[in-house]
Amino acid sequence: MHEMSLAMAAIDLAAEQATQRGFTKVTALWLEVGSFSCVDPDTIAFCFEAAAKGTAVEGAQLHFQHQAAEAWCYDCNKTVTLTERGQACPECGGYKLRVAQGDSLRITDIEVS
């Protein structure tokens, strides 16, 4: 369950950013979850709640923004949207693709008080 380590890293980063700016509480956190990130939002929400206990992030609302996967096709020189790994380019049918976005998990916004 790699979601626990991801949740803990998000908690640490959010708490650190809040403290550096003179705030004591994180009230909400927005996470962008790429469709190829292999992260289950329900699982990370569960882990987040458990790992946040006793921290400045405890009780913070967790919001998810989903990001589609996009790749650059070397055959047709276009950026295309993909729905699954190993998929051929929807424009030309080629398989020379490099994922450009949608394979990560990142914090996009932090609300503090």
Swiss-Prot record:
Assigned keywords, A-Z: Metal-binding, Nickel, Zinc
Signal peptide residues on this chain, from the entry's feature table: none
GO molecular function, one term: nickel cation binding
PROSITE patterns cross-referenced by the UniProt entry: HYPA
Gene Ontology BP terms: protein maturation; protein modification process
Keyword Metal-binding: yes
InterPro entries: Hydgase_Ni_incorp_HypA/HybF_CS, HypA/HybF
Family recorded in the similarity comment: Belongs to the HypA/HybF family.
Protein name according to UniProt: Hydrogenase maturation factor HypA
The organism of origin for this protein: Aeromonas hydrophila subsp. hydrophila (strain ATCC 7966 / DSM 30187 / BCRC 13018 / CCUG 14551 / JCM 1027 / KCTC 2358 / NCIMB 9240 / NCTC 8049)
